[in-house]
């Protein structure tokens, strides 16, 4: 007895694989991370639980998000210097997330949305870093 795999296409139908780039996916992941962070910053400001040094009124926050979204655009570039710049930035931001942010993430900020934003934001940064490392190594992903 031989097994025949089921297909969802009619016989003779040609299916072409969709392709994409690491840069496009990294950019999308970074835009999602920074958008979530912006939403949380606005939420914390409106709720009065923000870190006073990082609010919608401070130049630090505006600068951070301008650079973050700029890095998301830079992630689409194919040059090695751009790839290294993005990975260097991600290393710095992850260092801040792991070593500095816990010192200012006080009881007042530890809301359900605060924890959600923190965990998802860091997860997205780690995902972007993984994609960036694979891209820098010139790893090609193929369907199994």
Each language-model region and where it sits:
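Short, charged juxtamembrane terminal tails flanking transmembrane helices
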Residues: 2-12, 136-144
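Short juxtamembrane and helix-loop transition motifs at transmembrane-helix boundaries
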Residues: 18-26, 41-55
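Membrane-water interface at the C-terminal end of transmembrane alpha helices
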Residues: 19-28, 122-144
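Non-cytosolic membrane-interface motifs at loop->transmembrane helix junctions
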Residues: 50-60, 108-120
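Interfacial segments of alpha-helical transmembrane regions
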Residues: 20-32, 80-89
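Membrane-helix boundary connector in multi-pass membrane proteins
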Residues: 84, 98-117
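Hydrophobic alpha-helical membrane segments
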Residues: 85-102, 123-126
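Core segments of alpha-helical transmembrane spans in multipass integral membrane proteins
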Residues: 32-37, 54-76, 88-95
């Amino acid at each position: 007895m031989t097994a025949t795999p089921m297909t969802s296409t009619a016989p003779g139908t040609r299916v072409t694989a969709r392709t994409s780039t690491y840069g496009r996916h990294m950019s999308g992941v970074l835009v999602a991370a920074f958008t979530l962070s912006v939403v949380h910053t606005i939420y914390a400001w409106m709720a009065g639980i923000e870190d006073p040094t990082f609010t919608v009124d401070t130049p630090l926050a505006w600068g951070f998000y301008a650079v973050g979204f700029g890095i998301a655009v830079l992630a689409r570039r194919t040059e090695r210097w751009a790839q290294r710049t993005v990975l260097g930035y991600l290393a710095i931001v992850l260092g801040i997330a792991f070593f500095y942010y816990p010192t200012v993430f006080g009881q007042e900020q530890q809301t359900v949305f605060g924890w959600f934003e923190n965990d998802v934001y860091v997860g997205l940064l780690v995902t972007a870093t993984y994609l960036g490392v694979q891209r820098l190594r010139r790893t090609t992903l193929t369907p199994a």
